[in-house]
């Protein structure tokens, strides 16, 4: 029920937020209160009515970016996969294209990034020290029917590791930016702050969280993409 409500809520949000347009000076419809003073001044003036125009639904694409970290193991990742499945089906019915992406790391303890840092005599402030894993479960142009089996891969044992959200968001942003749709929405499904022990052990404790906030702010200030 919760997932269906979420799908319906997103669907309503997509249909809302569109600029409303009205036809005025009609003989029937909603009473146009802005024209009442002229009727009061001269009772021979007829009442004026207005009607909302039917707007064509904006060409829209939605990206779902799903946290595939270890903290999502069990019920959370199952719910996320079901949620992505239902949203994809629901929005496809509204002619909205949906891309489903996932993000995690290849390793628990840094992998090749950490090995390289060790070989270079551990320079200070090294930045990210883990290898990223970005997954395309469903591209925007692929129908849900052809991609639905891919969502089960989220439940694969051993996939869920660390979460480096800022770079994942940038990756998703770059993918949606090149789309031709008029309206672009990026929805992040995550259970908390970014965490990667290998990176945070040699950088400031808020290093990844700060980068995520900077990324969100940059996207909001420099693009028309809506982040949910």
Regions found by a protein language model. Give the residues of each.
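Acidic, glycine-rich A-domain
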Residues: 1-228
